[in-house]
Regions:
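N-terminal capping/small domains of soluble enzymes
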Residues: 1-96
């Protein structure tokens, strides 16, 4: 059974409302073998800075009685790497970035 799940969020039309959480999905490369990225309405990529950023010093994660505290600090390879490597990878899928 096919259902029309198309929706608009902030003026952007998505084929469905299923998107990834910012930061936890990176650029999706690590998940391409696990799920069909074409089924997602959008991929919300990890934050990208102009220059490569190492993030915060360790320890970055602390366990609490109710879960984890995360302070990775937006570690990323920078905008040039994102444009040259991640965007071409993501464009092969029929989903919004």
């Amino acid at each position: 059974m096919n259902r029309d799940m198309e929706t608009t969020i902030a003026g952007v039309r998505l084929k469905n409302p299923v998107t990834t959480a910012s930061g936890t999905f990176g650029s999706g490369r690590e998940y391409g073998d696990l799920i069909d990225l074409n089924h997602l309405g959008a991929i919300t990529v990890k934050g990208v800075s102009d220059e490569a950023w190492k993030g915060n010093p360790v320890p970055r994660i602390a366990e609490t009685s109710n879960g984890l505290l995360n302070s990775v600090g937006l570690q990323n390879a920078g905008a040039k790497h994102f444009i040259e490597n991640d965007i071409p990878f993501l464009r092969q899928y029929d989903t919004k970035i």
